């Protein structure tokens, strides 16, 4: 074949291919669904990473945070961003708060401890019976030796660190003693995390007695800011990107209590007598560490029994409707 013929065939081939490509593109434009662009534009508008403007005034236990100081401001911003973008963990904290904060609030009020201290439990344990690698346990992360020193029963059968009411009372006693020592609630709260000894040492070394002016261990330095970040997110979740339906919040446990001061050999049988099961009994009484109880001499235990219908989601939905109606009045 001569070179001119080859060039002619090659040119024809290229032209044919170009025409096919142009026709294909034209066809794709005809069938193009513009709604897909709209959907992507909407999604891009809804979700994007951003920073959050701090409120003009932020307090912890009615004590003002010095947000005019850049280091204070940046520390709070760090914890807010951490909370806002730890999606699943923070959602669970908000959902648990609906169940447990009423319990904690009542005990704080009874002891004249500021209401903001309830957010320390979120910083400590995310409102769960967490166990740290060091052995700190429960909502308030109490070490075994510290709990025993304050009269808590802690053994392989009963561990009162898992009891929300008793551990919150323990925390209140600590807060009050620390407040008496330091004269302000912010340092009292910080000492719960770092220990009074460590806080005292840094006060002596640095000649400062203001939490925001002290250089403390990283965990204690972040502690108050973390609690305040949870306070902001829990009280206004939608602003921080958490849209949670009321019915998705964990309901409060409904129960009544029975007094026990004698041996219980089998909590499964015990539960059946009250129309429930061991699983529900343990859910309400996580401080019972064994399926039996050998009580201490002259000690009475209050065991929670689920009220009728506590487990039903229908009751939860009805309660949420009542809450919304009350809220709208």
Show which residues each predicted segment covers.
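An acidic, Gly/Ser/Thr/Pro-rich helix-cap/linker signature
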Residues: 2-112
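Solvent-exposed, acidic/flexible segments
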Residues: 86, 90-101, 110-113, 132-140, ...
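Short, functionally critical alpha-helical segments immediately adjacent to catalytic or ligand/cofactor-binding
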Residues: 113-128, 188-194, 282-284
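Substrate-binding/active-site groove segments that recognize
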Residues: 135-156, 168-171, 175, 199-202
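Catalytic and binding regions of secreted/periplasmic enzymes and modules that target cell-wall glycans
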Residues: 175-202
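Primarily a LysM-type cell-wall glycan-binding module
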Residues: 246-275, 328-329
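LysM (lysin motif) carbohydrate-binding repeats in extracellular/periplasmic proteins that recognize
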Residues: 267-295
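Extracellular LysM carbohydrate-binding repeats and other cell-envelope/extracellular binding modules
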Residues: 284-321
């Amino acid at each position: 074949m001569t070179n001119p013929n080859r060039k002619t065939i090659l040119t024809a081939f290229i032209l044919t291919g170009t025409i096919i490509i142009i026709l294909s593109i034209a066809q794709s434009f005809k069938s193009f669904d513009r709604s897909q662009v709209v959907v992507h534009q909407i999604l891009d508008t809804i979700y994007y990473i951003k920073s959050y403007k701090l409120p003009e005034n932020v307090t912890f236990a009615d004590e003002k945070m010095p947000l005019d100081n850049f280091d204070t401001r940046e520390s709070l911003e760090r914890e807010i961003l951490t909370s806002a973008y730890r999606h699943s963990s923070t959602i669970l904290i908000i959902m648990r708060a609906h169940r447990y904060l009423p319990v904690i609030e009542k005990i704080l009020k009874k002891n004249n401890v500021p209401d903001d201290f309830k957010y320390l439990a979120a910083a400590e344990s995310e409102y769960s019976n967490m166990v740290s690698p060091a052995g700190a346990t429960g909502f308030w992360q109490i070490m075994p030796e510290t709990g025993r020193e304050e009269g808590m029963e802690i053994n392989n059968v009963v561990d009162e660190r898992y009891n929300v009411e008793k551990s919150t009372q323990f925390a209140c006693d600590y807060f009050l003693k620390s407040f008496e020592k330091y004269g302000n609630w912010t340092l009292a709260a910080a000492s719960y995390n770092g220990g009074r000894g460590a806080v005292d040492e840094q006060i002596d070394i640095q000649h400062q007695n203001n939490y925001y002016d002290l250089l403390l261990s990283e965990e204690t330095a972040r502690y108050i800011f973390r609690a305040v970040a949870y306070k902001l997110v829990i009280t206004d979740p939608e602003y921080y990107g958490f849209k949670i339906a009321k019915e998705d919040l964990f309901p409060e446990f409904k129960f009544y209590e029975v007094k026990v001061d004698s041996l219980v050999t089998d909590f499964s049988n015990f539960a059946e007598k009250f129309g429930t099961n061991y699983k529900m009994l343990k859910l309400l009484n996580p401080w019972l560490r064994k399926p039996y109880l050998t009580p201490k001499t002259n000690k009475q235990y209050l065991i929670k029994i689920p009220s009728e219908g506590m487990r039903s989601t229908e009751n939860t939905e009805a309660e949420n409707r009542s809450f919304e109606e009350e809220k709208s009045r």
